[in-house]
Structures are given as structure tokens and as C-alpha cells.
A protein has these predicted regions:
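Bacterial N-terminal signal peptides
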Residues: 2-14
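Short hydrophobic/aromatic-rich motifs at helix boundaries and adjacent loops
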Residues: 5, 38-41, 74, 222-223, ...
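Cap/insert and terminal regions of metallo-dependent hydrolase folds
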Residues: 200, 207-298
Length: 310
């Protein structure tokens, strides 16, 4: 398939750091640890590892099963120090404590994490409180501090007002991470854009269609948009799910309006999997660029797309 989306399924290959040779262009890659949602149907919950110059650096969400995928792919966690959480539903955060534990047991020196996630509202705690509940001094897994590498956490609770705008949260050595508020029913949620030199990928997280204008602002001209696709077009999914997720036709419209290079559909549900052709057709009503469905253990090499090219 022509286009800037280069996909390869990694079953047994290790995802380990490799040296950045002199003169080699900077690389940005995504490993899909989990492409599923809250249902148990053979996929891990939403989770991704982002590699910078071949080195795993960023964990984005940590759904149930992500821990197993990390082991299957023999991912070296030694330099993963940035954690991005789109929201605090279980299917996006259930394996976070397991990740912290595994990282501590495979590292010699102290680990300093930067963790980002939404502020709290209603039934949902702010991210700093969530992390403290898991691994703080009086947390559920406080025992973790008694063995393994020493871990410290700098947690930033991101504003959740829809008019906040795009916010830059990391800017170092060519790596830029930005976020914007989205809408996922009553659950505070954000989307992230990761840019490394001239390459960029955007993760929508779970979101309904009411705040796609914010996603467009964040994703404008990105090389790859990873959009969670958990429902069919109305009326083919339960009506209440449209208050949580964006249907395919709106995904296609959003991708077109954003001017992204490629689209990767993740967080799929069984009925979406069974209707791939219809989903693709609906998306292509608006978006003419490359579209793929994510699978667990898929590895995506981000290729920069010249402005206006497909």
C-alpha cells in the first residue's frame, strides 16, 4: 500500500534500543501493545510504547494485557520515563502498577518518571491522586518501594476545561509532546501529539464526537492519527455509546479536516471487527489517505509526509 503508513506485525522480535548511527535521520515509532477495549475478546486494552531513535521512551496508556505484550516483545523498559494517560478508565490504566513494578525490577539506578493525565471530576480522581493510590507511601502497592530500583514520580494534572487549547508539556532535544482536552462522557480525557523533529503522531484516546474540533486543532498536518474506533455509524451501535465514542464517518471527516497523512484505527470492539469493510467505506467517504486497523504487537514506523501529499 502506498502512503506514509508503514506497518509490520511483530510477534517474537525484540524491541530493544539500537544505536543512532551518525548521519541517520531521527526516527519515531509506535508499538501497539493493546488495540482492544474493555471487552475480553483476545486483545489487550489500549496501550502503546513510543520509540525515539529506536529507544522505548514513552508509555501511552496501560490497559489490561499491556504487561504481557511488553514481555512477549521483550521490550527494554530501561529508558521509559514519560507516561501519558488519556483517561482513567480501567481499559486504559489497569496495568499501570504492573508497568511500574516491571520497570523497577529491571533497572539498576533510580528512576524519575514524568506522568501526565487529566485532572479529576465526579467519580474520577485526578491523575496525581490515582498514581499515589497505586504506588504512593500509603498506596495499594506501597510494598514496591522496598525492592527494585527507587522510583520517584512527578505527576502533572492536566486541565480539563474544553476551552484550554493546545498545551505543550514536553520540549527537549527535538521531542515535543502536546495535549488538548477532549470529551468522553463524564470521564475527564485528553488527546496527545508526539512530535520528534519532522515526524508526528497523534493519539485521540477515547472521545465522543462533541469535541472533535479540539482534536482537529491538535492533529493538524500530523503524519499519523491513531483514532479509537469502538462504535459503528448510527444506529448500528447502542445509542448510549455515542455519548462516549466517535462513529466511523465522523472519524473520516475529522481526519480529512485535520489534514493528517494516515489513520490507524484502534480500541476496536467485536462488532467493529466484524464490519471492517463498512467502517472503511464510511471513513473513505471523507478521508482518502491510508487507513489501517491496529492489532496487538503491531509496530508502526512514522514517515514524514510532505505538506499536502498523500
Amino acid at each position: 500500500m502506498k502512503g506514509p503508513l508503514i506497518l509490520s506485525l511483530m510477534i517474537a522480535a525484540a524491541v530493544t534500543p539500537r544505536a543512532q548511527a551518525s548521519g541517520v535521520k531521527p526516527s519515531l515509532e509506535v508499538v501497539v501493545l493493546g488495540s482492544g477495549g474493555p471487552r475480553a475478546f483476545g486483545r489487550a486494552g489500549s496501550s502503546y510504547i513510543v520509540l525515539i531513535d529506536g529507544k522505548p521512551r514513552i508509555l501511552l496508556d496501560a490497559g489490561p494485557g499491556a504487561f504481557v505484550r511488553i514481555g512477549e516483545l521483550n521490550i527494554d523498559l530501561g529508558q521509559v520515563d514519560i507516561v501519558l494517560l488519556t483517561h482513567l478508565h480501567i481499559d486504559h490504566s489497569g496495568d499501570l502498577a504492573a508497568f511500574f513494578n516491571a520497570r523497577a525490577l529491571t533497572s539498576d539506578g533510580p528512576i524519575k518518571y514524568r506522568v501526565f493525565g487529566p485532572d479529576g471530576a465526579g467519580l474520577f480522581p485526578k491523575t496525581s491522586r490515582f498514581v499515589d493510590w497505586l504506588v504512593g507511601e500509603n498506596g495499594l502497592f506501597a510494598y514496591q518501594k522496598s525492592f527494585g530500583a527507587q522510583e520517584t514520580f512527578s505527576v502533572r494534572d492536566l486541565a480539563i476545561e474544553l476551552n484550554t487549547g493546545v498545551t505543550k508539556i514536553v520540549d527537549e532535544n527535538g521531542l515535543i509532546v502536546e495535549e488538548i482536552v477532549t470529551h468522553h462522557g463524564d470521564c475527564p480525557s485528553v488527546a496527545y501529539r508526539i512530535t520528534y523533529h519532522d515526524k508526528s503522531v497523534v493519539f485521540s484516546g477515547d472521545m465522543d464526537a462533541s469535541a472533535v474540533s479540539n482534536l482537529v486543532r491538535l492533529a493538524t498536518s500530523a503524519d499519523l492519527l491513531v483514532f479509537n474506533c469502538a462504535v459503528l455509524d448510527p444506529p448500528d451501535s447502542p445509542s448510549q455509546l455515542y455519548e462516549l465514542h466517535t462513529p466511523p464517518k465522523k472519524i473520516g471527516e475529522t481526519a480529512k479536516e485535520s489534514g493528517v497523512g494516515s489513520l490507524l484505527l484502534s480500541h476496536t470492539a467485536p462488532d467493529v471487527e466484524e464490519s471492517k469493510n463498512a467502517v472503511m467505506k464510511s471513513i473513505h467517504t471523507f478521508f482518502t489517505g491510508p487507513v489501517e486497523f491496529a492489532t496487538d504487537r503491531m509496530r508502526v514506523q512514522i514517515t514524514h509526509r510532505p505538506q499536502g501529499a498523500h
